[in-house]
Amino acid sequence: MGEDDPKGRQRLKLLLVAARHHLSGPDLRSVVHYLERDDVGFQVTLQLADPSQQPELLELHRLVITPALIKLSPAPKQVFAGSNILQQLKGWVPRWQQDGVVSGLGLSLRPTELDGSRTQKELQLEDQLLVLRQENETLIDRIHAQERLLRMVAHELRTPLTAAALALQSQRLGQIDMTRFQDVITRRLEEMEALSKDLLEVGTTRWETLFNPQRLDLASVSAEVILELEKLWLGRNVEIRTDIPSDLPKVFADQRRMRQVLLNLLENALKYTGNGGHITLTMLHRTSQRVEVSVCDSGPGIPTEEQQRIFLDRVRLPQTSDRTTGFGVGLSVCRRIVEVHGGRIWVVSEPGEGACFTFTVPIWQGQGQEWGQAVLTEGELEP
């Protein structure tokens, strides 16, 4: 796409702003294949831009969510964003073709009945209305993206606050010494400071920019999480079993986000496991590309019809007892964190036999590994 066109077709210049893991998905591949078709009727020039390498494009084109496809020429500029770019494009290409025919005739011609009932001006007004509707849909997508970021950060704030409160209670009861108390409070304050920065960036950033992937020892992270939750399980005689091989490879992930996923899953398991029950944390090196992590409990289980819904935004299942509050925003946050890392998350459960939540994380491949490479390998994006 982009060379001189022997058929003399009008040039259509497009800019696709997308991260590498977006380009590996079927949605954007379908967009590219569609633009390569002869019946599109244009000489298409498609430029690709990675927002992590060219962040100025987000401000220039007022983009909050990616991927986004931008029509640069012919004017007017249009922006298509969200999960249905191909459908939007198919609706607009015929109109662009018609606009090209009309402009080729020259604007000095008197308005004519192009389709037997509507004049050129009426068609132009209709196109302007459709542009406004499309911009409104894009704005709604941006608002939803910001809402998801806010829910994630707000939900994550609970963890350091709860840990600080438990540490204060333990210190007052003489269960921990002053040195450990100060260490816990210092770490929790650092976490809250980082979260406050996330909140300040919610209105201007993308979801992916809140992640800092690095070489990570997931076994050590899980040990810290279990220790942090000990006040919740020791007093109830709940046994936490771990099955983590000593040769488990390091993963390529954001430490804060992986800790958040493990905390959410273990907290949910503790909520639904009765006194005297057990929880199992397992980590397996399934392939050369990923580590598989499972958190299984001996609770009441999850109804089959609810097992897909629990990972959706704004879904909270009814509580099963006075002690539980239902699966809520935490699982949708877990799903998004795992997917940004290039993995997936699912649950296996039978009523009365507990629930087992499993997610995958990419393995650290070496110093040259880039963010998004794991997603290209897995090829598993949002369902």
From Swiss-Prot:
Listed name of the protein: Adaptive-response sensory kinase SasA
- Has the keyword Electron transport been applied to this entry? no
EC top class named in words: transferase
Q: Which residues carry this modification: Phosphohistidine?
A: H155
Q: Which InterPro entries match?
A: HATPase_C_sf, His_kinase_dom, HisK_dim/P_dom, HisK_dim/P_sf, KaiB_domain, Kinase_SasA, Light-responsive_reg, Sig_transdc_His_kin-like_C
Recorded catalytic reaction(s): these are: ATP + protein L-histidine = ADP + protein N-phospho-L-histidine
- Known EC number: 2.7.13.3
In its keyword annotation, does this UniProt entry include ATP-binding?
Answer: yes
The species this protein belongs to is Parasynechococcus marenigrum (strain WH8102)
What's the name of its gene? Answer: sasA
* NCBIfam families linked: PRK09303.1
Q: Which HAMAP family match?
A: Kinase_SasA
Kindly list the biological process annotations in GO that this record carries. Answer: circadian rhythm; osmosensory signaling via phosphorelay pathway
Keywords for this entry?
A: ATP-binding, Biological rhythms, Kinase, Nucleotide-binding, Phosphoprotein, Transferase, Two-component regulatory system
